[in-house]
Amino acid sequence: MTSLTQFEQLKTAGYNTIPVYRQRLADTDTPLSVFARLKDYTQAYLFESVEGGENWARYSIIGLGESTVFSCNAGQLTIKNAQGNITTQSCADPFQYIRDYQSQFKVPPHALIPDLPQFTGGLVGYFGYDAVRYIEPRLSNVPEADPVGLPDIWMMLSKTVIIFDNLKDTLFLIVHANTTDEEAYQRAQNQLDYLERLLATPVSLQAKKHKAPHFESLTGKEKFLESVETVKEYIRAGDVMQVVPGHRMVSDFDGDPLQVYRALRHLNPSPYLFLVQGHTLTDNTPFHIVGSSPEILSRLEDGIATVRPLAGTRPRGKTKEEDLALEQELLADEKEIAEHLMLIDLGRNDVGRVSKIGKVQVTDRMVIERYSHVMHIVSNVQGEVRDDIDALDVFKATFPAGTLSGAPKIRAMEIIDEVEPVKRGIFGGAVGYLGWHGEMDMSIAIRTCVIRENKVYVQAGAGLVADSNPESEWNETQIKARAVIKAVELSSNGLIL
């Protein structure tokens, strides 16, 4: 608990944004029951994690967005400030805007408040795949506008956070106080009192049935198969070694995004489980992003940058023996191994761009991780970053993931622009946070759906190399999308298994 004396000491030390917190038992609450009490807020999020597809991680994070939100689309930066006023300006480099914006918050380092988890707030949201166009000038040939209608980048300021310690069955209630306000400490205490009252209110998680979904590919199988052949021609010509084209599926939706999240965390527990809800600033319509991504884009923590290439896929077996046979088949597949080794090299190169010389290493090499419907080959690449590098530098060096673009990365993305009919939107981008202390954790937006204006969208891709079989690659996209589609179906049935 933050005392008034401690608060004043931190204020005197020059910190202008100070976490005021309480810790209490949470043995009768769950992250889901807490989020259910917050889900009517305009901006909110829920982050959970299952490590290796099997064990729940220590912390679950529930956050409320503040009034401050910003988004960027087609070079236009739209900002909603703390007073609710909205302005728009041209912006060639949104990353510099983010860097400048975050620099105004002087938050005490973790060492001064060691009881708190590493992440206690910051900026939360997403970078869509097309955010790469603010990084790489060659990618200026933008496909048609994304009919889903979400911006390339969307971030909310998060200063009110509830963090579950799943190991100790406790939770932290955290409110960040602005010390320029003379009543800041008392206002923070009042907000904590409000959160306590909110958590004490009854909540129902009773799921309701709604209209069953019917997903259709907007590209269609025939056009996807044609795109595979087009990509293979580029590979044969020596233009590129690998490309990862995808396609989008859509269905009508009149259900509850939280039910979809509950279904997805049951069906496909993953390292990155997330539900992000917000409103677009241009037309003030709500959206929800629900995902169970198995793959990190990049992480920066304690000066170590991490990427975790995931490539090589098989469906899960129906029996333990079949599952093991499929694992052995996957590890013996020369195409899959070649593709994965290519992506390890790409990950080493990306991390190497921001790391000290000789400080990049592969810490895990080609291990199998199992999820509900698929198994993958996974490796882990880490680097000790240079002293002049920050989280956004790491993000820009690693974005987008090679597993969602190809190699060489920029040429592969040019080909994706050619064969995919519209902007990708969130698919292949990243969802996560930029913390107060320079830490970052971003997952790749795969195994993810977007819910907006009574529609639900699911996308999936396939990594193509020279000997790819078009029919097999189409089937791979169906396998990858299966968990999310099944989650939408399960939610429509009232979560009755």
Curated annotation (Swiss-Prot):
Pathway: Amino-acid biosynthesis; L-tryptophan biosynthesis; L-tryptophan from chorismate: step 1/5. Feedback inhibited by tryptophan. InterPro entries: ADC_synthase, Anth_synth_I-like, Anth_synth_I_N, Anth_synth_I_PabB, Chorismate_C. L-tryptophan binds at S49, P271, Y272, L273. Its cofactor is Mg(2+). It catalyses: chorismate + L-glutamine = anthranilate + pyruvate + L-glutamate + H(+). Signal peptide: none annotated. Keywords: Amino-acid biosynthesis, Aromatic amino acid biosynthesis, Lyase, Magnesium, Metal-binding, Tryptophan biosynthesis. Chorismate binds at G312, T313, R447, G461, A462, G463. Its EC number is 4.1.3.27. Mg(2+) binds at E339, E476. It holds the Pfam family Anth_synt_I_N. It is an enzyme of class 4 (lyase). GO terms for biological process: L-tryptophan biosynthetic process. Belongs to the anthranilate synthase component I family. Heterotetramer consisting of two non-identical subunits: a beta subunit (TrpG) and a large alpha subunit (TrpE). Part of a heterotetrameric complex that catalyzes the two-step biosynthesis of anthranilate, an intermediate in the biosynthesis of L-tryptophan. In the first step, the glutamine-binding beta subunit (TrpG) of anthranilate synthase (AS) provides the glutamine amidotransferase activity which generates ammonia as a substrate that, along with chorismate, is used in the second step, catalyzed by the large alpha subunit of AS (TrpE) to produce anthranilate. In the absence of TrpG, TrpE can synthesize anthranilate directly from chorismate and high concentrations of ammonia. This is Anthranilate synthase component 1. It comes from Acinetobacter calcoaceticus. The lineage of its organism: Bacteria, Pseudomonadati, Pseudomonadota, Gammaproteobacteria, Moraxellales.
